[in-house]
Amino acid sequence: MKLSAQRLFAIARKEAMQLRRDPRSLAMGFIVPAAMILFFGYVISFDVKDIKLGVLDQDLTPRSRELVEAFQGSGWFRVTERLTRDAEVAPLLDRARVRMVVTIPSGFQAELAAGRPAPVQALVDGADANTASIALNYANSIVLAYSARAALGMQDIRPPIVVQGRVWYNETLTSSNMIVPGLIAIVMMVIAAQLTALTIAREWERGTMEQLAATPVHSAEVVLGKLLPYLVIGLIDMLAVVLIGMFVFGVPLRGNPVLLFAMATLFLIGSLGLGIWISAAIKSQLLATQTAMQATFLPSNMLSGFMYDIGNMPILLQAISHAVPARYFINVTRGIFLKGVGIPVLWAQGLAMIAFATIGLTLAVRSFRKEIE
């Protein structure tokens, strides 16, 4: 049977009418994506600042107070507890009232004056390994800078070698600039697959699948017709989350927005096709949405490079990550948002998006044809 645009759009209109009468799908399509971006965008942060610091100054001299002020004025630490004895250290760390305790022993100023090393102890809460590692690095930087000034008699003398570091693409090292473009890919895939995971299962539960199967239409027309309204919703969602990223989180969009939305269209088609494939195989709306969530959220979150560097994963997981579509779209969103790159850099990701859209549609059409036959 030859494909007919008239029949395809008739099915699309019918699906759009059903969608308007389904508050759950409307909420999932128009409210959930923005809510997820806002929630995860604020909750997920790798910025470590204002670390709660306890100080046990047993020397109580001008030099020890200068070191404490160096911690306080760094912008990395906030002195929230001033201790008077060693017994107070453990309870503070146990109750997580501070992340680190710096102990300046008595004789600190005398040791510096004599030109001998003056030990300073830093006890850090290692329950959060990432924060602990960063806090120790911050503390080492502060103490090294103070030590250099102390060795020079507290004079501001320029060192002979100065590293002039410059960060490209994310100049302020703001974690939201990295997180939000990645979140866009995760949210788009999860929501798209969730929406279409309901569509065929809904036909089974309402008993209208037999009527649909008896209709003289090609299975590709049914799949494309059911997919089209959700593609429109997905592109509206994409526009919404991009605007939220730019104007709420301040993420710069340095690249071509047309290229971003072209790539997003391919990514959405593949995700929507994946949802229809799941929906055709599983005839329960509840089970279909649960399966779609497990098939999209976990791999996209864990194996796409969104949260964890793929290069640090075991070789097997690195190989598996090549089959995760979100991996490629995250490279697209970060590349266009932060780097402003185009097709000369993103052509491989573009091919991956085309392959994903083709595979998603093929799986959807074949699974639907198998079910109605």
Can you annotate each of these PLM segments?
Residues A27, I31, T208-M209, V222-V232, ...:
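Short hydrophobic alpha-helical segments within the ABC transporter permease transmembrane module
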Residues L19, A96, A193-V217, L227, ...:
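Transmembrane helix boundary and interhelical loop/hinge segments in multi-pass membrane proteins
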Residues D22, H218-S219, G342:
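Short coil/turn motifs that cap or connect alpha-helices
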Residues S219-I244, F261, T265, G350, ...:
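Selective transmembrane-helix segments that form parts of the transport pathway or gating/packing helices
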Residues A5, L60, A185-M189, I233, ...:
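Alpha-helical transmembrane segments of multi-pass membrane transport proteins
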Residues F39, L60, E81, P91, ...:
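Membrane-spanning alpha-helical segments of multipass transporters and channels
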Residues M1-N177, V345:
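Extracytoplasmic/periplasmic domains immediately adjacent to an N-terminal transmembrane anchor
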Residues I44, I179-A197:
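Long, hydrophobic alpha-helical segments
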